[in-house]
């Protein structure tokens, strides 16, 4: 689940932090292996309901691959020891849709460097797929890799060029492409290109994505359960029709309560919450291990003085009321819970900046729900917010909701779904992943049966798609591969980071609903000093 341009205005947090990791389209190559397979265009079979418009090919020498600057995003780090590869770009259309969808497939040119695996990669915010670093990374690991632009271009933040049709209505064909149609097309085309390039079929197909890419992975499991044997879908923006409105909630609260705390004041509440709930796992490490069990109330900070920009400020009851409402998440005027807020401990820097609405939500409401680019989302009231929320559900759940808990067909196909979500995610509320998993549990026989094909891991102290003070996953895709190909289901997910003292910190993250607890002995920085328990 981005970028900014419109957000650049007052971002306290760098824009890059709001986006799933991406790379630029172009790459520069230095040296590399000699090619062993001819890189040229080949005949591509059109997916059902689509027509191939063009096929192009481009050979790359490999070696060290660098990427150009693409502000405001960070430049991806150079990737070394990349084998020579071939890019096949397929452009297709869906008759009557007036769309032009590009699918880029990257293939190791030496057949001996191909593992027989296919990896489709996901996007970020309103970017359906990244044609740069993710593909090169996958090629280095021996995959045939693919990405799609869904026909909506290469900007994760600007939907003005495609969201609305000339008549001012939502461009439904392109929204369908962005939501799910292009993902299935990519799977079909990517496997077909691999077969014709090597003369051998793909043995194992995987999805790999975070944020929007996570939502896309769940869309594939729900809508096209046979496309992938393994799906890695992290920090997923599922239930998009709700999430994409709910993340405006802080603006509504500020507007209605007429209280406008600074980021310094807001983060004082987070600091206090972390201090109060830090030792829930038995260790004081500056991280709330299980925010759902942190019942600290913002009102406890009322009257406390905090230093902000050299000035002493006293926290008021109005400040506390605003913070508690943001943490609780959106509700209707009659008190019905609509969706979730950020966890305690997650930064307020993106979802709660006064007068600066989260750009994903801002664009969604302006272009898709209201169909009016001039609509001001900072003026929403509790009542108008609830009305927009309901309209988004009514008009878009079937198109892009991605909240269907019925994964029966995916289970029957033998698929495996692995998802992790940071407990300090500042963009996509972690409880959305918990809500979805619990709906699947209720529908499909309980957590033990669901664990046979779908596992969720909640990572303490980890921010959106990685980052933050908590241990980061070391090889989630590798864990998924072991599950799919060897039948070794991950009981825990290995994670690691470097502590403030420079020492390595490791954790074996427990699968939901379990949480980690310190055993009372051993090095608190070592994974072996913790056990998984059900609270």
Predicted regions and their residues:
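Cap/lid segment of the alpha/beta-hydrolase catalytic domain
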Residues: 74, 115, 124-199, 245, ...
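Glycine-rich nucleophile elbow surrounding the catalytic serine of serine-hydrolase chemistry
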Residues: 209-219
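Short, solvent-exposed loop/turn and secondary-structure capping segments
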Residues: 99-103, 129-135, 150, 156-161, ...
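Alpha/beta-hydrolase fold nucleophile elbow
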Residues: 200-211
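Catalytic-loop region of hydrolases
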Residues: 4, 26-116, 132-133, 284-288, ...
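C-terminal subdomain of alpha/beta-hydrolase-fold enzymes, centered on the catalytic histidine
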Residues: 328-511, 516
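Secretory targeting and sorting signals
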Residues: 1-26
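A catalytic-pocket lid/entrance helix-loop region that shapes and gates access to the active site
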Residues: 219-221, 226-331, 458
């Amino acid at each position: 689940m981005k970028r900014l341009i419109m957000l650049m205005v007052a971002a306290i947090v760098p824009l890059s932090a709001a986006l799933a990791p991406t790379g630029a389209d172009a790459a520069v190559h230095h040296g590399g292996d000699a090619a062993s397979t001819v890189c040229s265009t080949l005949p591509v079979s059109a997916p059902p309901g689509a027509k191939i418009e063009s096929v192009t090919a481009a050979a790359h020498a490999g070696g060290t691959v660098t990427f150009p600057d693409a502000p405001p995003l960070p430049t991806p780090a150079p990737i070394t020891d990349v084998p020579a590869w071939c890019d096949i770009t397929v452009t297709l259309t869906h008759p009557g849709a007036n769309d032009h969808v590009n699918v880029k497939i990257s293939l190791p040119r030496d057949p001996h460097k191909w593992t027989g695996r296919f990896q489709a990669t996901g996007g970020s915010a309103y970017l359906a797929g990244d044609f740069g670093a993710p593909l090169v990374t996958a090629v280095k690991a021996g995959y045939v890799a693919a990405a799609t632009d869904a026909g909506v271009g290469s900007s994760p933040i600007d939907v003005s060029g495609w969201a609305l049709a000339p008549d001012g209505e939502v461009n439904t064909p392109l929204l369908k492409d962005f939501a799910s149609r292009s993902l299935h097309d990519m799977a079909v085309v990517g496997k077909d290109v691999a077969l014709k390039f090597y003369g051998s079929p793909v043995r194992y197909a995987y999805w790999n994505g975070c944020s929007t890419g996570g939502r896309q992975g769940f869309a594939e499991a729900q809508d096209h359960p046979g496309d992938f044997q393994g799906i890695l879908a992290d920090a997923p923006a599922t239930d998009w029709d709700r999430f994409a409105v709910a993340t405006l909630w802080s603006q509504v609260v500020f507007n209605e309560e007429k209280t406008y705390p600074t980021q310094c004041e807001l983060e004082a509440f987070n600091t206090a919450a972390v201090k109060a709930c830090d030792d829930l796992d038995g260790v004081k490490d500056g991280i709330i291990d299980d925010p759902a069990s942190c019942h600290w109330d913002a009102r406890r900070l009322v009257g406390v003085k905090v230093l902000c920009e050299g000035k002493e400020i006293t926290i008021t009851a109005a400040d506390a009321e605003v913070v508690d409402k943001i943490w609780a998440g959106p509700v209707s005027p009659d008190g019905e819970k609509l969706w979730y807020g950020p966890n305690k401990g997650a930064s307020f820097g993106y979802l709660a900046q006064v007068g600066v609405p989260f750009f994903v939500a801002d664009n969604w409401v302006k272009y898709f729900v209201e169909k009016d680019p001039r609509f001001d989302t900072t003026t929403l009231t509790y009542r108008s917010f609830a009305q927009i929320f309901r309209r988004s559900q009514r008009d878009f759940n079937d198109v892009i909701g991605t909240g269907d808990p019925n994964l029966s067909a995916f289970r029957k196909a033998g698929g495996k779904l692995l998802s992790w979500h940071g407990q300090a995610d500042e963009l996509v509320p972690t409880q959305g992943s918990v809500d979805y998993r619990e709906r699947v549990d209720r529908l499909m026989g309980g957590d033990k049966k669901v664990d046979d094909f779908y596992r969720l891991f909640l990572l303490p102290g980890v921010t959106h798609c990685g980052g933050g003070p908590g241990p980061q996953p070391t090889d989630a895709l590798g864990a998924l591969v072991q599950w799919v190909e060897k039948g070794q289901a991950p009981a825990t997910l290995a994670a690691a980071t470097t502590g403030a003292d420079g020492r390595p910190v490791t954790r074996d993250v427990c699968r939901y609903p379990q949480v980690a607890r310190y055993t009372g002995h051993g090095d608190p920085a070592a994974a072996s000093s913790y056990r998984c328990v059900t609270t």
